[in-house]
Amino acid sequence: MDPVLLPTLFDVLDLLASKAGPVTLDDLNVARRVTSRRFAEIGRVLEGFQVAERKDFSLVPSVNFQQFVECWEVAGVARLDCINAFFRHYRPYDNFLCFLETQKHIEVPPRQDSEARHNLGAELKEKVGLTFVAVDTFKWWGMAVAQVYLSHIGDRNIHWGGARPDIGAFENSLLRHYAQVKPLDGFANIAQLADRVCRELNIAFVRFESLFEQLCFQEPRRYVTATSLARLPTSKSPVQTILPRSKAKQIADNLRLGKPVEWTEKRLMEDGVFVGRRNVKMVRILLEVTNEQQ
């Protein structure tokens, strides 16, 4: 297993898309310093994705590469699903997702419990041939492409998040948990709702956001959203998703800091979701909508 971090992989993918010729270690070192051994590991992973080939100590695009670049620019969650399809050609990552889908979640012991973490690593090695370090890397890969949900509100486990429920099943789950969180003045915290719904339906947070936005647009009178300065005080749940290539590069150009491009968007679940361009943290769901409200 070659646990390569996403920023490094996407630096190389960007170089492959930008250069007319092969990408070498010297090319990559302009943006991010890596060793020759790490460059070889990157090559093995990208060959696994079926988007690049190793040739004379360099990397060249495969016949599938242009399709990957097109995936990279697709809007919404469809972009993540498309990229994940390439990721899954890489056997160790696919083994991780298959195991997670079967188990539904992986219980991760706290850092101070070294014995329990060692035992988990031994179990993972035996069952799926992966080290603890590999799983710790792949959980971020999976989150970035809407296949993993990392809970920091309900628990701290790695949850399968690759399910694709229809809008009806999503709404039923949302309504059930809305009734259970006992909202103040009718307004429930969206992060708390998301944690419950994501764990029940086995969906990633970004898919929750997409389906929630869809409901808000379909039934704007029923789903009343609000902004709030309040954040859940006891949790800090990171969310990251792969940005479209053009958007990531535009953000980097606007900042002009001379730093590597940030290929993923990073935020906190507690900061709510976007409905259109509006960031909302609270929702009130009207169980009955009168003709006047419609």
Q: PLM features: what roles do these ranges have?
A:
Residues 189-192, 210-213, 219-294:
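Long, low-complexity, charge-rich intrinsically disordered regions
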Residues 1-216:
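Donor-sugar nucleotide-binding helix/loop cap in glycosyltransferases
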